[in-house]
Amino acid sequence: MEKSTQERFRRVIRVSAAISRHFESNREHHREDNNWLEMLFKELLVALKIHGIVIFKPDPNSVAPRKGNAKSLLRNVSPSVVLLVVSSSYGIHYAASSFTSLGRNPNGLLSLFSDVAYLFRIATALFTAFYMTSVSTSVSSLLSDSTTIFQKTLPPNAIKSIRGYVIGMFVFAFANLLAFLGVKLTELYQSGFDGYYNYNLYDLAPESKSVIYYAVPALDIAFCTIIITMPKWIMGFHVSVCKYLGCQAVSLSGTFASERVVVLKRAREFREYHSALCELIFRFDEIFNLVLFFWYADIIISFVLSVPYIIIRTDNSTPWTYAFVIIDVACNVALLVVFNMAASDPGRLARDAQLVVLKMSSRADPDDVRLNHELLLLANAVKVAKVEMSGWNCFDVQRGLTITVLSMLSTYVVIVYQMMHHTL
């Protein structure tokens, strides 16, 4: 009896040790996947982390617990919470200062277009920060699952293409930040510190020109620039992930289309991989389809309201102000085009998969009943995925839609210019 009890305890200990080793290996594998993804998107992830949005959170088991004093509580405050508080506070401040400056600013009515555009961009930044705070875990899980499912099967040229997109979007977002910073600095240079206090800081300039006198406008410009350009980093990350999913689709189709001999196992693997990738794209669409509408609205409204401001202020602004505003508008239009191009990239899966099925069917043995049945299931799965993908908000993008939007915007510019030319 005593021996059987000891044997039972030993068995329980062995099973517990095996379970712990299993979970530890899974945790290590998951951490390796995250490290690989962090290296793939490292520039944009660092920029998002600076802004308070953390996609890949650290493992809670690897973080040592801290004592419950006031200093540790401040350390444990999420940076995203700080971002939300700062964004909302600055949005209220900017709305109030814009409203109160209408009576004091001689160009108040002329700058009303840009003020409304900036208010909407601040509101978009606040909503984006709140939304990304709530879905950052889902985005991290989606990217980790994609690496686990496809086991890092991306070819080197696909990885190089994704890295090019990541670096390009990083440079683009940073250029947009510099352009907007240039707009605010030239505004400060043109109005002077006293004028900046009068128009943007409720005419609360300190009497003595101390460090605070120069620091407050600098902080105001820094906060405004960081908050308004913050969504551009997230848009760049969204475009890069679209490219990543598109490369997964191209790699998957190319791998199976190049096989000369079709067997039952490979046909079933293609159907499973195709379904898994469609599920990942569907999850990505569910995560970003809501905020995508606000991003498009932000881009178009900024363009629509900035064009009259540029035309009205041509004779009153310095060449640098004019140039920086044009760069900011051009970045928004370029982002609209890049957005549509990247969003249509995962849609290759629906087109290329049909070609792969046709190639596999032409090479299959007509007498192999099980293989042909599997190919029939694969063809049906591809057709169903194509129908579902046509209703996904993030990826139902056509070239004609982009051309139509750009034509409408260019027509709008011409009409506004003619109207302003005859009015002024």
Descriptions of predicted regions:
Residues N61-V63, S138-P156:
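Cytoplasmic membrane-interface regions of multi-pass membrane proteins
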Residues V81-Y118, I149-G236, V250-K265, V307-A334, ...:
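Helix-loop-helix junctions within predominantly alpha-helical proteins
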Residues R121, S144-Q151, C247-G254, E272-S275, ...:
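Generic structural signal for well-ordered, non-membrane alpha-helices
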Residues L126-T147, M235-A249, N332-M360:
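Inner-leaflet juxtamembrane helices
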Residues E2-V81, I167-A175, L264-L424:
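Terminal membrane-anchoring module of integral membrane proteins
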Residues H22, N34-V46, S114-T124, T128-S144:
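Membrane-cytosol interface segments
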Residues L110-F113, S136, I212-A215, M235-C242, ...:
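Amphipathic, non-membrane alpha-helical segments in soluble helical-bundle scaffolds
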Residues F130-S134, L154-I159, G254-A267, K359-N372:
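Short intracellular "coupling" helices and adjacent cytoplasmic loop segments at the cytosolic face
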